[in-house]
């Protein structure tokens, strides 16, 4: 089978399967795929995006996949181009996102011969398995769960010898949906606690909310923007061992990965009866202490204790009333998340922003939240936000300045969607000032990493629309009066050391207030 026929066969099958979004990086060896994709786009069958940087292209595709829950294909030429997909491939693997990576390759006979732009691409994106393709295959049984790597061998000639009517009669089939998992039934204790990780183990918010109602237990959510009944600021006040002891549950159900808060993980570790629910192959039970592991949301046999739930709800209300924030990164997060419009999307950058959302955002609904929590990296965050924005009328992103600069090349090929990116400018890696590393010698050089850049000028250099804000009122104005298209809001906050001190003060003040409430602790 020649290169043109092989490429057309693959693209035709993908379209029939329901793949509608393709992200292409230009190259020579992937020319058969590039030409086939252009023809499919011209026929109105697919959405084709072209990104020159493979690393950013993969994260862009990952963003579309996160927002659509459908396979999105990303295509490149051979050699180092393929290696640039590895960060996004790892994130997709650990998040089980539907990312289809297609790398073009030379024929197998040219491997390890010194042929130009040729390396061993089979296994290049481990732990992803590689499907090495030299002739037509049936792809439908390959696209089931999580990311997939197709490595396609193209021999010369790479250009079509005829026009061909290969798209005639082509129609997408219904998109693949995950098969339902058999529900189990479990008996639960009256004084329990439901804890939901940010990724929710892939379960729908509505399904988890139903489980919470059936349990009649309090709920702690790493994503408070999806669960209005969540206990407010729990990760802050449960840093206190006395409060953890006072509110110690008889049983905990954990859904997904809880990776943001040491205090919540301490609460889990101190409970003798923990049930973990996660359908993925990597079980989310870091200390191997779970008494039971389930792969689906169970039916529950419950004997609710109304006093237990009321006690927790009272705690949550008291926490909301007794948290006081000055202008800081914490107030920035609280202000943004409170004022986001309904039915908008929010991408939350790794490191400090996602932890502050978990700790300081008031529980609410109406916001579709996304984050790269598979490996929690700071790379590719702008590109991921660009991809998510392709699927929503209004999208927002919150990034730290180092995270922003790490993917700055994405601005060379920006999205045209309505996206506002908030950049928290504290001149360096703010999270390290809140960790034990803050006290080591040489901290600023090896952890703080100040960049000393004028981010407004950097963004303007890419032709971006940018404003700088220094107050909550200006920040609110930038949210409720957004301009169309891509917009950047650089947020000037106190220095990193001051922010770390404010975080300690807020936490200690809240803990003291809750401990003094005689009816709460």
Model-identified regions with their sequence ranges:
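Phosphate/pyrophosphate-binding active-site segments
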Residues: 1-2, 267-354, 466-521
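N-terminal cofactor/phosphate-binding cores enriched in small/glycine residues
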Residues: 4-75, 81-83, 360
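A short, small-residue-rich loop immediately preceding and capping a beta-strand
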Residues: 20-24, 46-49, 67-103, 248-256, ...
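Conformationally flexible catalytic loops at phosphate/diphosphate-handling active centers
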Residues: 29, 125, 139-190
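Thiamine diphosphate
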Residues: 92, 102, 109-125, 361-521
